[in-house]
A protein has these predicted regions:
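A short glycine-rich, Lys/Arg-flanked "PGG" loop and its adjoining helix->strand segment in the class I
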Residues: 161-178
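Conserved class I S-adenosyl-L-methionine
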Residues: 82-92
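Short beta-strand element of Class I
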Residues: 33, 106-111
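Short, glycine-/aromatic-enriched active-site segment of Class I SAM-dependent methyltransferases
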Residues: 183-200
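Conserved SAM-binding loop of SAM-dependent methyltransferases across substrates and taxa
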Residues: 93-104
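Flexible, glycine-/basic-rich loop-and-beta segments that form/coincide
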Residues: 237-271
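S-adenosyl-L-methionine
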Residues: 109-162
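A basic, amphipathic helix-loop patch mediating RNA/tRNA/ribosome contacts
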Residues: 1-51, 85-86
Length: 271
């Protein structure tokens, strides 16, 4: 019956095919979701409980592809999160949170300004504190009363310039963080192209250096830099910066130009 039909992305969540609508949309975009044997191309397609919905792609390790970003940081920066108290800034579906837990974190504060996005799998996990509808820029010890060992930041529509000063007081001395540098939210409107994509490597270099400067001003040392293994939703190349909260703040002079060049070469080869 027509009144029982729902958007297929919402139906995928209620039927357990996907952990969240955001993830369902990713799965549909991959071309691996089938409705009654036919490929689904739009998340807004209507379907009912009686329809056969299948996902034929590879099973993923995390609730969202965000986990792959932190996974690379764990591997490249040689992070050990065993027994750590962590903060996931911009948690969304919880890919970073999931990766933290799978790498031994004992507790994760999942912070996001939105609501209803965190995967049900993570919401029901006793190790996860869901801080939805929380603007991290104005967060206090009331929301996070204990100092963290590690934090990650994957935020949109705001510069890390405003996130890092709020993060520093919440980390233990000697604590560390991995932040995703998104050129489209750091470069300024004049440097952002169509569909919000920043392609110019020179702008990427400038953006990364600016973020490193923000980090030092907020009480961090810049330890390492690499590029994210997956692009942003509109195709932006993004970068992973590894920070440490030290008594002496410094930039260990990561090869910014080299990392940017390697990132562009990697994604160009994959096109």
């Amino acid at each position: 019956m027509e009144e029982n039909r729902k958007r297929i992305d919402a139906l995928m969540v209620s039927l357990g095919v996907a952990p969240s609508r955001e993830k369902a949309k990713e799965m549909i975009k991959s071309g691996n979701v089938y409705l009654n044997g036919k490929v689904v191309s739009k998340a807004g397609l209507l379907a009912s409980d009686c329809d056969i919905i299948e996902y034929k792609g590879e099973s993923e390790r995390y609730v969202s592809r965000g986990g792959l970003k932190l996974e690379k940081a764990v591997e490249v920066f040689k992070l050990d999160l065993s027994g750590y108290l962590c903060i996931d800034i911009g948690a969304s579906t919880g890919g970073f949170t999931d990766c933290m837990l799978q790498n031994g974190a004992k507790k994760v504060y999942a912070v996001d300004s939105g609501s209803g996005q965190l995967s049900p799998k993570l919401k029901s996990d006793h190790r996860v504190i869901d801080l939805k509808k929380t603007n991290f820029r104005y967060i206090t010890e009331k929301e996070i009363p204990e100092r963290a060992d590690f934090a990650s930041a994957d935020v949109s529509f705001i510069s890390l310039k405003y996130i890092l000063p709020a993060l520093s007081p919440l980390l233990k001395d000697g604590g560390s963080a991995v932040c995703l540098i998104k050129p489209q939210f750091e470069a300024g409107r004049e440097n952002v192209g169509k569909k919000g994509v920043v392609k110019d490597p020179r702008v990427h270099i400038k953006v990364i250096k600016n973020v490193c400067s923000y980090a030092v001003q907020a009480g961090f040392s810049v330890s390492a830099l690499d590029f994210s293994p997956v692009k942003g939703p509109e195709g932006n190349i993004e970068y992973l910066v590894y920070l440490k909260k030290d008594e002496v703040q410094s930039v260990s002079a990561p090869d910014v130009a080299g990392v940017v060049s390697a990132a562009h070469a990697c994604f160009k080869a994959g096109e």
